[in-house]
Amino acid sequence: MVRENGVPEVLLVHRPQYDDWSFPKGKAHEGESDEDCARREVGEETGLECVLGVRLPPVFYESRGRPKRVSYWLMEPRGGEFTPHREVDRIEWLDLDEAGERLSYDHDRDLLAAVTELL
């Protein structure tokens, strides 16, 4: 999440394998904390180094018949640069309304609503 000119924007990633738009996320390595996983996954997917802010409500959904729980934080980018790769070929900073239209999944729109309430 970043504020440009007072307008909150969120970062979305496009995953070509699924042709979807979502928030950066991923799986924790064994013994890795949720916080370290969040920083690592955002870095791997976007190339950005971020500082964690407020922890958001967990998101629960089903993927390929298995339940998923994902932890998210508001984050502030501090550096880095995106380079397209196999997992994520595009990123976009969008205002909250644009992000709601672009997101591919209802559970991500629910998370966006929680973010909107915090701002």
Residue ranges and their predicted role:
Residues 116-119:
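Charge-dense polyanion-binding interfaces
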